[in-house]
UniProtKB/Swiss-Prot annotation:
Changing residue 267 to R: Found in a patient with sporadic ALS; decreases protein stability and expression; decreases protein stability and expression; decreases single channel activity; increases chloride retention in the ER while decreasing ATP-induced Ca(2+) release; in a knockin mouse model causes enhanced ER stress and motor neuron degeneration in compound heterozygosity with a hypomorphic allele; leads to embryonic lethality with a KO allele. The modification Phosphoserine is found at residues 438, 464, 509, 524, 532. Changing residue 263 to R: Found in two patients with sporadic ALS; decreases protein stability and expression; decreases single channel activity; increases chloride retention in the ER while decreasing ATP-induced Ca(2+) release; in a knockin mouse model causes enhanced ER stress and motor neuron degeneration in compound heterozygosity with a hypomorphic allele; leads to embryonic lethality with a KO allele. The chain crosses the membrane at residues 185-205, 217-237, 330-350. GO terms for biological process: endoplasmic reticulum calcium ion homeostasis. It comes from Homo sapiens (Human). This is Chloride channel CLIC-like protein 1. Residues 380-389 have a biased composition (Basic and acidic residues). Its main location: endoplasmic reticulum. Residues 1-18 form the signal peptide. Residues 19-184, 238-329 are lumenal. The gene is CLCC1.
Length: 551
């Protein structure tokens, strides 16, 4: 019995050792033999076990060195695997880049490759990047699984449309930076400059408003004339081109020379049909320039029609929209009363505008009247003149009218009289200094002062007066003529010398001056508008009696 038990234990031990040899370690991939499906016994293990058998007290230093040796061998194997994998990766990508570079050379060769004579060449190409192309490139760069065919197609579609580099296109431009054409910017700045000049110089204060409006309308009309002519010419040219395109099939028919059969056929067609000759229309289109289809009279008629009807068209359109919006919220029964009220309002407005025409005329100021020519050697009464303080400025000249009566003179009448005297004397002096002695160019308000200063003093007497005909230079003016002698009775008033006969000064006697002063003092104030010899003579200080505050 004991022997049988001992035998069983021995068999179990032997079977355990045999099973230990057949056991596969899942972590030991280096000693696993895939062909036999068993584990290989490494020499290091046998050596270690032998050494353990020989010397079980092996030091830890030997075990550490053995571990480092195994680590080095594993690192070497890993490097070899990565190198092999890299070679396989490059072997697959090289053909793709080879074809890509070959395509670039083919496209550039069509334009010309650089050589010893040409030197460097600069090309431009377009790049089209699709979503599929982007995904393939990202897979390739990230080291993921990629397909050489898909990447090759993606790279082939990127570069297209090769051409030479245009250096002018890449230059800096104003439109690229600011998004506006420089011509438009210049025009806007020019308009702003004109507005600033008008505001700074106050030009509108020197030109009457209706004069400005008239000039603007005239300039607009002339500008629109050229504008409409160009528009009509463009329309005629476009219509001419369309007709030429329609006559394209007749090029061969009308261009070739007609034989006798064609002449017979054309005679038959013109005799039995009412159709126009197509070749006539064809040659008219070829020979007549569209510019002759737009005469200036047509442009003038269109411009005038547009100038008149276009504003009325917009006014009517706005009025219609206004009435439509007004009647939309009003009941149908009230439409008629509302229209009547609107008509009455328009008539009232027109009536008020007509009544206020004289007010507008007073604000704007009438046109300056032409100066009246003076009649030589004729005595004429002095017309009382008036300086108008609120007359136009700039283009408008100072307006002189009849003298204001005593009831019309305001608190500033004396100031206006003084200003009138200064301006009138300055005007007369300037005219005589420039040598302008022609009576036709003098205005009516220039002569009385000259007569008052320069005509000889005539004293009524029973004897004919003796005038000093010796020319005397006064204020740098040489007398040009001698006054005409006249024998008058004592009851008659002496005629003042006018025109060119009064340009020379005549010396009078002291008695004559005293007589004139007495006669002036004896004059009544009621004769303000009647000329008298005493009033025709300048006062003691050379002032015009018309401009005196006393009237």
């Amino acid at each position: 019995m004991l022997c049988s038990l001992l035998l069983c234990e021995c068999l179990l031990l032997v079977a355990g050792y045999a099973h230990d040899d057949d056991w596969i370690d899942p972590t030991d991939m280096l000693n696993y033999d895939a062909a036999s499906g068993t584990m290989r016994k490494s020499q290091a293990k046998y050596g270690i076990s032998g050494e353990k058998d020989v010397s079980p007290d092996l030091s830890c230093a030997d075990e550490i060195s053995e571990c480092y040796h195994k680590l080095d061998s594993l690192t070497y194997k890993i490097d070899e695997c990565e190198k092999k994998k890299r070679e396989d990766y490059e072997s697959q990508s090289n053909p793709v880049f080879r074809r890509y570079l070959n395509k670039i050379l083919i496209e550039a060769g069509k334009l010309g490759l650089p050589d010893e004579n040409k030197g460097d060449m600069h090309y431009d190409a377009e790049i089209i990047l699709k979503r599929e192309t982007l995904l393939e490139i990202q897979k390739f760069l990230n080291g993921e699984d990629w397909k050489p065919g898909a990447l090759d197609d993606a790279l082939s579609d990127i570069l297209i449309n090769f051409k030479f580099h245009d250096f002018e296109t890449w230059k800096w431009r104003f439109e690229d930076s600011f998004g506006v054409d420089p011509y438009n910017v210049l025009m806007v700045l020019l308009c702003l400059l004109c507005i600033v000049v008008l505001v700074a110089t106050e030009l509108w204060t020197y030109v009457r408003w209706y004069t400005q409006l008239r000039r603007v309308l005239i300039i607009s009309f002339l500008f629109s004339l050229g504008w409409n002519w160009m528009y009509l010419y463009k329309l005629a040219f476009a219509q001419h081109q369309a007709e030429v395109a329609k006559m394209e099939p007749l090029n061969n028919v009308c261009a070739k020379k007609m034989d006798w059969t064609g002449s017979i056929w054309e005679w038959f067609r013109s005799s039995w049909t009412y159709k126009d000759d197509p070749c006539q229309k064809y040659y008219e289109l070829l020979l007549v320039n569209p510019i002759w289809l737009v005469p200036p009279t047509k442009a003038l008629a269109v411009t005038f029609t547009t100038f008149v009807t276009e504003p009325l068209k917009h006014i009517g359109k706005g009025t219609g929209e206004f009435i439509k919006a007004l009647m939309k919220e009003i009941p149908a029964l009230l439409h008629l009363p509302v229209l009547i009220i609107m008509a009455l309002a328009i008539l009232s407005f027109c009536y008020g505008a007509g009544k206020s025409v004289h007010v507008l005329r007073h604000i704007g100021g009438p046109e300056s009247e032409p100066p009246q020519a003076l009649r030589p050697r004729d005595r004429r009464r002095q017309e009382e003149i008036d300086y108008r303080p609120d007359g136009g400025a700039g283009d408008a000249d100072f307006h002189y009218r009849g003298q204001m009566g005593p009831t019309e003179q305001g608190p500033y009448a004396k100031t206006y009289e003084g200003r009138r005297e200064i301006l009138r004397e300055r005007d007369v002096d300037l005219r005589f200094q420039t040598g302008n002695k022609s009576p036709e160019v003098l205005r009516a308000f220039d002569v009385p002062d000259a007569e008052a200063r320069e005509h000889p003093t005539v004293v009524p007497s029973h004897k004919s007066p003796v005038l000093d005909t010796k020319p005397k230079e006064t204020g740098g003016i040489l007398g040009e003529g001698t006054p005409k002698e006249s024998s008058t009775e004592s009851s008659q008033s002496a005629k003042p010398v006018s025109g060119q006969d009064t340009s020379g000064n005549t010396e009078g006697s002291p008695a004559a001056e005293k007589a004139q002063l007495k006669s002036e003092a004896a004059g009544s104030p009621d004769q303000g508008s009647t000329y008298s010899p005493a009033r025709g003579v300048a006062g003691p200080r050379g002032q015009d009696p018309v401009s005196s505050p006393c009237g």
